[in-house]
Amino acid sequence: MRFSNKFKKVPYLLQALLNVCLFFLALALSALLISETWYIVLFVYKSLFNKVDSYYEMLGELLIFFMYFEFIALIIKYFKSDFHFPLRYFIYIGITAVIRLIIIDHDQAISTFWWAMAILAMICGFFIANRRNSVVEH
């Protein structure tokens, strides 16, 4: 009996370790978000004077900005919802990542098609998860 009582504290210790690590990850992501914001501001400033023809790089950086933002929002939601990661935030991050991939690497039409199908699958999964939640609530 005494041996099992010691292991009852293990989940709490692991939860505390996870919380500390997520806190530092949120700080690092916040620093990267600020850095990305500065890069976007500089890019816009330079493009005003140089008349850049291609804005794919700018759009890619903007989507990276949103991915940092979504990861930070996911960590905030984790702490606000009693240490639970909502599924929809992972789907948002996945959709944003695939859209960035399509914008950056769109040379082959068939791969773009399959990436678009991946987005469609994530959207369908999102609606199924939301429908299940609304049925459970009613």
UniProtKB/Swiss-Prot annotation:
Keyword vocabulary terms for this entry: Cell membrane, Membrane, Transmembrane, Transmembrane helix
GO biological process, one term: cellular response to phosphate starvation
CC terms in the record's Gene Ontology section: plasma membrane
InterPro entries: P_starv_induced_PsiE (IPR009315), P_starv_induced_PsiE-like (IPR020948)
Cellular location(s): Cell membrane
Keyword Membrane in record: yes
Cell membrane is among the record's keywords: yes
Transmembrane segments: 12-34, 56-76, 84-104, 109-129
Topology of the protein relative to the lipid bilayer: Multi-pass membrane protein
Domain of life from the UniProt record: Bacteria
Protein family according to the UniProt entry: Belongs to the PsiE family.
Protein name: Protein PsiE homolog
Protein's organism: Bacillus subtilis (strain 168)
Lineage per the UniProt record: Bacteria, Bacillati, Bacillota, Bacilli, Bacillales
Gene that specifies this protein: psiE
